[in-house]
């Protein structure tokens, strides 16, 4: 058996160093097979809503997300103009005149409802929709739940990925975020929550502007990680139905990320992911887990260590799915991203609906703007 392994390793290494052109005759049904593959391919749309959501999709366009349509949605025309996306939608033109929602979630909600037809057209045909935003402002907080509800009613697996505001951003944004998160959790199959305050535990001396960029990057990694396990050829890919099984009606989810380049890199990366400050919950009751393993040269033994470690820490009946992406730029590092679903979180309770923040709390200072 060992000799067989050595022979395979030698052959593959030889093939990688000396690429040979091999002419493979085309089968008569190849074209038909290509059409079928194209038809059954999962159609994934990523919708960034509001300022933070648009920052996230802008970053996604920079790094690239294989097999996803990127859509930017905002009430602020000036901000939307700067964003890179496959499609842009300025919502609430009548209500906001392209000037934004003024930190009022009610205006964001009404803007999305006003532009329902455009949003539905953009979501048409999607099998899976990611809705990403930063909660606490007006557009993301108000419009994201409306968009998520539309996507879900249209039959798409709907996963929202959101950040909660830093404490330093004030009580008004915190109240807005609480209201928006409860509505979003009800509108989505799964909502992945990233508390920005937890970033400060990782790097307490991080400059404010850099902290926001780190939050954006975590959103990007979450969406890109899940999407490319389905769409991008890798060492081990996930079937869309596997992802649906874990995230359909998955409730509240949280994410942990870890990486290591030591001798025990696999186990250390898994431990870091599950002990990440971002994963601020007891995961022993988690009903599902999605594991994304990335590295330049991930070994089978290492993948097994990671999967076994995560499986031991969640509910014994939890559905655990995993995939491996080859990322040459990681060199000797293994990165592990774990998303646990069906958890109980202090950030979301469904005992009562939080009322929309009062006008006094949310209305910005009135500025007379002359009619153009």
From Swiss-Prot:
Q: Which residues lie within the region annotated Disordered?
A: 352-372
CDD domains per UniProt: FtsZ_type1 (cd02201)
Q: Note the HAMAP family from the entry.
A: FtsZ (MF_00909)
What name has this protein been given in UniProt? Cell division protein FtsZ 1
Question: What does it do?
Answer: Essential cell division protein that forms a contractile ring structure (Z ring) at the future cell division site. The regulation of the ring assembly controls the timing and the location of cell division. One of the functions of the FtsZ ring is to recruit other cell division proteins to the septum to produce a new cell wall between the dividing cells. Binds GTP and shows GTPase activity.
Q: Which GO terms describe its molecular function?
A: GTP binding; GTPase activity
Keyword Cell division assigned to the entry: answer is: yes
Give the family, as the similarity comment puts it. Belongs to the FtsZ family.
A biological process from GO: protein polymerization
Intracellular or extracellular location(s)? Cytoplasm
Keyword Coiled coil present in the record's keywords: the answer is no
Subunit and partners: Homodimer. Polymerizes to form a dynamic ring structure in a strictly GTP-dependent manner. Interacts directly with several other division proteins.
> Can you cite an annotated GO cellular component?
cytoplasm
Question: Which residues does GTP bind?
Answer: 51-55, 138-140, 169, 173, 216
Keywords from the UniProt entry: Cell cycle, Cell division, Cytoplasm, GTP-binding, Nucleotide-binding, Septation
């Amino acid at each position: 058996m060992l000799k067989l392994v050595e022979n395979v390793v030698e052959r593959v290494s030889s093939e990688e160093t000396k690429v040979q052109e091999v002419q493979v005759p085309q089968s008569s049904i190849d074209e038909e097979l290509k059409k079928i593959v194209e038809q059954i391919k999962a159609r994934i749309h990523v919708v960034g809503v509001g300022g933070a959501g648009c920052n996230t999709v802008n970053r996604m366009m920079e790094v690239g997300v294989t097999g996803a349509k990127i859509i930017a949605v905002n009430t602020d025309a000036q901000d939307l103009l700067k964003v890179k996306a496959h499609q842009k939608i300025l919502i609430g033109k009548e209500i906001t005149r392209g000037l934004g929602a003024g930190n009022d979630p009610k205006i964001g909600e009404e803007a999305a409802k006003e532009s329902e037809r455009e949003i539905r057209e953009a979501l048409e045909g999607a099998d899976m929709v990611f809705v990403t935003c930063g909660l606490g402002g007006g557009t993301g907080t108000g419009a994201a739940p409306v968009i998520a509800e539309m996507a879900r009613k249209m039959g798409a697996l709907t996963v929202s990925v959101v950040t909660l505001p830093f404490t330093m951003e004030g009580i008004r944004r915190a109240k807005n975020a609480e209201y928006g998160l409860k509505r979003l959790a009800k509108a989505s199959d799964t909502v992945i929550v990233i508390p920005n305050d937890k970033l400060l535990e990782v790097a307490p001396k991080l400059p404010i502007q850099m902290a926001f960029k780190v939050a954006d990057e975590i959103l990007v990694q979450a969406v890109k990680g899940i999407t490319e396990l389905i769409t991008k050829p890798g060492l081990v890919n996930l079937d869309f139905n596997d992802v649906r099984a874990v995230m359909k009606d998955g409730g509240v989810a949280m994410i942990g990320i870890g990486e290591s380049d030591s001798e025990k890199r696999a186990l250390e990366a898994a431990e870091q992911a599950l002990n990440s400050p971002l994963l601020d919950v007891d995961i022993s009751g988690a009903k599902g887990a999605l594991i994304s393993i990335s590295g330049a040269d991930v070994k089978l033994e290492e993948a097994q260590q990671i999967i076994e470690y995560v499986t031991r820490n969640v509910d014994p009946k939890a559905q655990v799915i995993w995939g491996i992406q080859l990322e040459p730029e990681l060199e000797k590092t293994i990165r592990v991203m774990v998303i646990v679903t069906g958890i109980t979180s202090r950030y979301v309770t469904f005992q009562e609906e939080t009322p929309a923040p009062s006008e006094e709390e949310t209305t910005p200072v009135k500025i007379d703007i002359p009619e153009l």
